[in-house]
Amino acid sequence: MAEPGGAAGRSHPEDGSASEGEKEGNNESHMVSPPEKDDGQKGEEAVGSTEHPEEVTTQAEAAIEEGEVETEGEAAVEGEEEAVSYGDAESEEEYYYTETSSPEGQISAADTTYPYFSPPQELPGEEAYDSVSGEAGLQGFQQEATGPPESRERRVTSPEPSHGVLGPSEQMGQVTSGPAVGRLTGSTEEPQGQVLPMGVQHRFRLSHGSDIESSDLEEFVSQEPVIPPGVPDAHPREGDLPVFQDQIQQPSTEEGAMAERVESEGSDEEAEDEGSQLVVLDPDHPLMVRFQAALKNYLNRQIEKLKLDLQELVVATKQSRAQRQELGVNLYEVQQHLVHLQKLLEKSHDRHAMASSERRQKEEELQAARALYTKTCAAANEERKKLAALQTEMENLALHLFYMQNIDQDMRDDIRVMTQVVKKAETERIRAEIEKKKQDLYVDQLTTRAQQLEEDIALFEAQYLAQAEDTRILRKAVSEACTEIDAISVEKRRIMQQWASSLVGMKHRDEAHRAVLEALRGCQHQAKSTDGEIEAYKKSIMKEEEKNEKLASILNRTETEATLLQKLTTQCLTKQVALQSQFNTYRLTLQDTEDALSQDQLEQMILTEELQAIRQAIQGELELRRKTDAAIREKLQEHMTSNKTTKYFNQLILRLQKEKTNMMTHLSKINGDIAQTTLDITHTSSRLDAHQKTLVELDQDVKKVNELITNSQSEISRRTILIERKQGLINFLNKQLERMVSELGGEEVGPLELEIKRLSKLIDEHDGKAVQAQVTWLRLQQEMVKVTQEQEEQLASLDASKKELHIMEQKKLRVESKIEQEKKEQKEIEHHMKDLDNDLKKLNMLMNKNRCSSEELEQNNRVTENEFVRSLKASERETIKMQDKLNQLSEEKATLLNQLVEAEHQIMLWEKKIQLAKEMRSSVDSEIGQTEIRAMKGEIHRMKVRLGQLLKQQEKMIRAMELAVARRETVTTQAEGQRKMDRKALTRTDFHHKQLELRRKIRDVRKATDECTKTVLELEETQRNVSSSLLEKQEKLSVIQADFDTLEADLTRLGALKRQNLSEIVALQTRLKHLQAVKEGRYVFLFRSKQSLVLERQRLDKRLALIATILDRVRDEYPQFQEALHKVSQMIANKLESPGPS
């Protein structure tokens, strides 16, 4: 079937089949701005697309009744819809409208199609037009216009009537116009069977269509489209413009007049249909391609993102499960090891209990041994007189000393090993505890992480389901949520401000309430005092009114005393206020001093513990020093001939001297710290005592002032009563005097004369008693002299017996101390040997473990360094690739801009050529029907302007749809970020619940503060008790410290004496052995000749001189060791001064 000439001249490729240029245009639309994208898309699609025309049949009558015409030229064939795509440049230029220039020279575009059928003879200007176009230089244009013969033959229409292709408005969603319908109805009245020649029609449409394309491009690039409020979201694309433009042909004069009448009839209907029709595009519509592509890309990105997140979550869950299983296994092993350690701890407790019981038994045995020692003291005194017994005992002791020295050396080694083993066990225990805590913390972290991952999985599933919802509903939900969040945040701020203001108000109210209560108490106290004074004054006034005139002087005196007492009361009140303020300050200082005292007590306890440890270390070092001195003497006596031993001993002496200096300096520092702490404690305790005394004195002063006020008030009332009583007594005594005088007959004997007589009698009696007392005193003095003589004799005998007893007790104590020291040394040596063996074993194990751990750490460090370098190189490669891509994109953008500029330049050239062709055409055409042609041109111009506006609106709406997709992505990302920041939006009910919980917590905190105040008061009482007990213990400690210092001095003195005696005993024993060997003839001379003996003597003297110089140098460098080295240097000097053998 032939193709109609005006309606649907060409159809576009089906199923979106396009060339590679079209695909590149679609792909590049994401990287450039919308104007650049549209122009580039036009150019590439025009060059690369292929053309596949189809024949379409339409129903013109149904379209005329509905009054709608397709603006994009889409054909609906019996309810079926076809996909629309772009044609190449040849078909695009053939489909454009014919265009005429207005008197002002403006170029306009038409909105609707005009299917006219005119015979070939109605176009008289065909040859002239062809010659003009050829002379104007339109060679490239004619090459495009003259296509292959197959394409031109397809454009020849059939004799059947052809109309514009129409379709229902509900399916296609396009806006129709009234004039188009009128022209279409007018075209149906033309005779059928008229066909326009192919070549003329083709060339005519080609020239004007290119002009339309250039004008549309200039309008699109220069202006920014504005979306009117009544236009729907979908508009036809510019790429579909050739479908409309293919339907316009050159009308005849009769057809022009008919079209003008139809336009006048339908101009009123166009305005009504523009705002009333709501356009809804079908999903398969070609205008929806860009929006669907953007939405598809967005959804694909979301799906890929969710897939990656899901894969990461699956991998993380697998790893967490594996780690959890491994942690369970490790936890079980650690628990088993902990049970084993607990068993070992119980066994060690049992061993400790057994050792304590054995110690008690040994102490009991020691007491029994002491009892036996008292019995054997008498026998020991008798045996001392025997020289042979003493010699045998000396030999045994020397042998024992030799053995003990060897054992001592072994025990020292064992002690070192045991200390190292103990340290190792302690470190292993601490490390096991730390590892257990870390494992518990890691298990908790993994559980929380697993829960969080499960929540994230559920959240991602919900997000995946929510992606299918509509964008409009999501936007509304987000806006509502934002408004709710803003309202909640505003309400939260308001409530927090109210809460802060209420707290401040409560504080001010409490302060004002306290001030009012204090003022009320003061006023009540003053009112009571004034009431008491008023009542007292009323009573005194009533009594004074009842008295007579004789007591007026007494009344004046009492009034003056009352005024004085008032002054005293006011002074006492002022003193009381001042003392109350002082009391508060003292109480605060007392609290500060108590806090400082508690801190000092803690520091004192720590320092006492350190002091005990240092003293123990000092004792150990002293014992080591003694043993090393003895070893040095023995080594000097035994190995006088070896030079290596002398060097070793010199090094040993230097090392011991350094250790001794370090220990002495450390001891002096600790003693200084202890003295400083004791001074601080005494200072704080003295301050505390002074504050307590002042507090007690102030309390007593307050009590005294109150008692003085009450006593003064009672004294006033008591004195008034006493005055009355004395007045009555005076009257009574006057009456008695008168009566006595009357009885004596008028002679008055005074009471003094009677008293003189009575006293004279008493004097006589006392004189007699004094004589008797003198006699008895003399007798008692004689007896007392005899008793004192006897007492002096008894005291002399008692002193002699005490001296004898003291001597015996000292002897007893000396022997007991020697026995106890020997036993203690033996036990310590055995214990040290065992400990040193264990320490040596543990030390070896620790060294092996440390070596293995260090190797593992080095390997791990190497692996981590390699991984870090590898990741760094990969990231550098990625950055280089991204930089290259960015450079490529910038170059492509620049090339596209250059192509766009060139295309615009070509468009301007074509416009000039078209203008020349139009001028030639206007000169060729006749003047018949110029009025109708001008009217038609005006209408065409108006429709072209309308078409440009609609195309701009269409492009604007397509961009809005694409931006909506992008906006949706931004909204989802913002929602995800907000959801991560705040998982749960706070509502009014949640806020109310939280407020109730906070109030409940505040009540609990207040209760807790009350309980804390009670406990603080109790602790203060206990602190006072503890401070008093601490003072007592400090006094006891000072006494014990003094005793300890004296005992330590005695111990050092006795130790030096013991070492001296032992050295003398060893020397005497060796001398005795040599003498016995000489006596028996077994002695072997070391030096056979006298000359060798002299040489050996000289060598030894040189070595002694060298040792003496070394000792002098050490004494100069280390003055703290002068006392210890003085004896050694003195012995060496004596040896050097002694003459050699003759």
UniProtKB/Swiss-Prot annotation:
Gene Ontology cellular-component annotations: axoneme; cilium; cytoplasm; extracellular region; motile cilium
GO biological-process terms attached to the record: axonemal dynein complex assembly; axoneme assembly; cilium movement; determination of digestive tract left/right asymmetry; determination of liver left/right asymmetry; determination of pancreatic left/right asymmetry; epithelial cilium movement involved in determination of left/right asymmetry; epithelial cilium movement involved in extracellular fluid movement
InterPro entries registered for this protein in UniProt: CCDC40
Residues bearing PTM Phosphoserine: S252
Localization in the cell: Cytoplasm; Cell projection, Cilium
Disulfide bonds: none
Keyword presence, NADP: no
Biased composition (Basic and acidic residues): 11-27, 35-55
Acidic residues compositional bias, start-end: 63-96, 265-274
Alphabetic keyword roster: Cell projection, Ciliopathy, Cilium, Coiled coil, Cytoplasm, Kartagener syndrome, Phosphoprotein, Primary ciliary dyskinesia
Coiled coil location: 293-319, 349-470, 526-627, 684-950, 1005-1054
TM region(s), chain numbering: none
Residue ranges, annotated region (Disordered): 1-197, 251-274
Family: Belongs to the CCDC40 family.
Described purpose of this protein according to its UniProt entry: Required for assembly of dynein regulatory complex (DRC) and inner dynein arm (IDA) complexes, which are responsible for ciliary beat regulation, thereby playing a central role in motility in cilia and flagella. Probably acts together with CCDC39 to form a molecular ruler that determines the 96 nanometer (nm) repeat length and arrangements of components in cilia and flagella. Not required for outer dynein arm complexes assembly. Required for axonemal recruitment of CCDC39.
Disease: Ciliary dyskinesia, primary, 15: A disorder characterized by abnormalities of motile cilia. Respiratory infections leading to chronic inflammation and bronchiectasis are recurrent, due to defects in the respiratory cilia; reduced fertility is often observed in male patients due to abnormalities of sperm tails. Half of the patients exhibit randomization of left-right body asymmetry and situs inversus, due to dysfunction of monocilia at the embryonic node. Primary ciliary dyskinesia associated with situs inversus is referred to as Kartagener syndrome.
Protein name, UniProt field: Coiled-coil domain-containing protein 40
Organism: Homo sapiens (Human)
